[in-house]
Amino acid sequence: MREIDVGEIIKAVEELCIKANKILPDDLCGCISCAEKSETDELPKKIMGTLLENLDAAKELNLPICQDTGMAVIFCDVGQDVHIVGGDFENAVNEGVSRGYTNGLLRKSIVRDPLDRVNTNDNTPAVIHTRIVPGDKIKLTVAPKGFGSENMSRLKMFTPSASKDDLMDFVLETVKLAGGNPCPPMVIGVGFGGDFEYCAYLAKKALCRPVSERNKIPVYREMEQELLRRINATNIGPPGFGGKTTALAVNIEAAPTHIAGLPAAVNIGCHVTRHAEKTI
């Protein structure tokens, strides 16, 4: 049994909140750079160039990449041989978010209730997903989620008679309905299977997968590639002004489901699909 003090968790979450909001993962930066080179028309090429300049400026000036610093979504893999001491785990995660958004001078975007809309003033509470896994470590992934793209996401409960084409049509329809609202080029997270809630979780988790990494199961890998081709043929472009680059990647995650259902969820990420991770 290994003891981990909540102080380490607080510090790690604080650092990850700041890092995720100011430095985009290298693979996504590279993908945006490649997309800029592939654009041939003047306007989309200029826009993609401006996005790259913004990424560089955020890093150099130690500023957030985007003014919407998101709702803090935290994926926590907690080893079963870990004993957390000094306090409560979820309280520690939320304290880390509070410190990260306060000390990092990040916008506070969370309201305490959907109807009274009073700001909590420290971007808490976070959305926390915890799994108990083998081992004696804690892996934390912080994924701040802006709501320009979140608001464009959808879920549909298909029946088992739905075909692969039906599922792909749903993803494509979701992207077309979104248009330029999610600040394309987008990263498209897709979840198939599970139940109503788990399907949405899969789509969200898919956004944390590197954009250069395809699904290992051939049928889903082929769907990712075909969907990316179809989405980029829509000419929505960056940021809705036309062009070859509407999406940078389509990431699909799938899970077992009930014999009577086939849930499908699409969680859209903008070109600033942020995440940072650390293992304690």
Predicted features and spans:
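Non-transmembrane, aqueous-exposed alpha-helical and coiled segments at domain scale
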Residues: 1-190, 195-280
